[in-house]
Amino acid sequence: MKNNFITTALLVTFTVCVPTAIAQQWQDVPAYAKSQTKNVLDRSIFYVPLFGSVYRAKFEVLMKKLPGIRGVVIHNHGCAGMWGWETTVAQFYYREGFAVVTPEFVTRDGNKLGCPGGTSEEMLKRAGERANEGVYTAKNPARLSARGDDNQEVIRWLKTMTDLPIFLSGHSEGCRTTYNWNRTEPQVKGGICHKQSVNRLYEHLWKWDTRLPMWSSNEDEDPWAGGSKQFPAVGFEEKFKDNPQNLTSFRFAGNSHDPLVRPGEVQSLRDWLSKQVSAPPIKSQNGFNYEDALQNIQNELKNNVK
């Protein structure tokens, strides 16, 4: 009961203390400069089917040599940066046969978290403060545009290796990064939004082309998505009213912000991915001998020595 009271109080703080006009202003800081994309790959973790988490040189070689990769997912973390739940999501994708890149945005020079704190209650409270300030918050269009710049640079790099379909994924603030995407990039084939809404305080951020398919998940009373018993988290149905066939929405009557934890949630996303990509997940080596790739990786590592 006490925890429910705290959550409700913090939700009120988070939603009421944020004037819409301030939130919609573009507020730039050096951390959002486009020049900071130059080290995005140094701020990223990479995953490959069968292998899991790998370093960059190994990723680059296996993208060209490992047969059967279904596509590439760029997964964008939430307001707290790269934590365990983001890794859990990335692991789901690679086990489904996708290569994955997870850029960490908050480690750009001079950047800050959108929700600092040592407990979930403190983080939610301080997320409201950051939103009220209007700079280091997902409500700031400049922040999401900068995250889009990071994604664009990752895509540019990926295109030097593969023409596989690319999917933009995100959790929480990373979901807002995904639905803020409006750049012409034919290789991007869809979006995936974990546990985030598009309520009125965030509508100014929506730029997604609804001709592209999207999978989304939301819990009715998730405080991080602005949800409560009286006012459930707002899904994307209204945004997709002209193309409803392109939205797959997973809803749950709960209050968790954690991705891929509810019955049926994993299967829903798995089914959606299979509709987008006809190739099946990689279940075995299929004759691939890792030793055949070693020389290429060794050469990459030699070339990378400064």
Residue locations for each model-derived region?
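Primarily recognizes the serine-hydrolase "nucleophile elbow" in alpha/beta-hydrolase
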Residues: 149-210
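Serine-hydrolase catalytic machinery in alpha/beta-hydrolase-like enzymes
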Residues: 50-63, 69-160
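Sec/Tat signal peptide C-region and signal peptidase I cleavage site
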Residues: 18-23
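Bacterial N-terminal signal peptides
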Residues: 8-17
